[in-house]
Swiss-Prot record:
This is Conotoxin Cl6.2. Residues 1-22 form the signal peptide. GO terms for molecular function: ion channel inhibitor activity; toxin activity. It comes from the Eukaryota. It comes from Californiconus californicus. Keywords: Disulfide bond, Knottin, Neurotoxin, Secreted, Signal, Toxin. One of its GO terms (cellular component) is extracellular region. Residues 23-47 form a propeptide.
Length: 76
C-alpha cells in the first residue's frame, strides 16, 4: 500500500514538472539549431574541392572527386 502511494505521488510530481516545462517553452526556442533555420546548406560545386569537367579522375568508376557524377578516365 505504501509503495502504491509513493508511485502515485511520483507520477503526479513528474506530470506537474512536464506541464511546467511545457508552459515555459511556449515562447519558442531561444537558440534553435542551425540546421532547422537553413544555415547549414550543402556546399555548391564551386565551394568544394572537386575535379572539373574533362580532367583526369581515374578508370571506370563513380568518382566522388568529380564535380559531375560520371567518371570514365575523365570527369563527364
Amino acid at each position: 500500500m505504501k509503495l502504491t502511494c509513493v508511485l502515485i505521488v511520483a507520477v503526479l510530481v513528474l506530470t506537474a514538472c512536464q506541464f511546467t516545462a511545457a508552459i515555459d517553452s511556449r515562447g519558442g526556442q531561444e537558440n534553435p539549431a542551425p540546421r532547422s533555420t537553413g544555415l547549414m546548406r550543402r556546399k555548391s560545386q564551386t565551394e568544394r574541392n572537386c575535379i572539373p569537367k574533362n580532367h583526369f579522375c581515374g578508370l571506370l568508376h563513380h568518382s566522388r572527386n568529380c564535380c559531375t557524377p560520371t567518371c570514365l578516365i575523365v570527369c563527364f
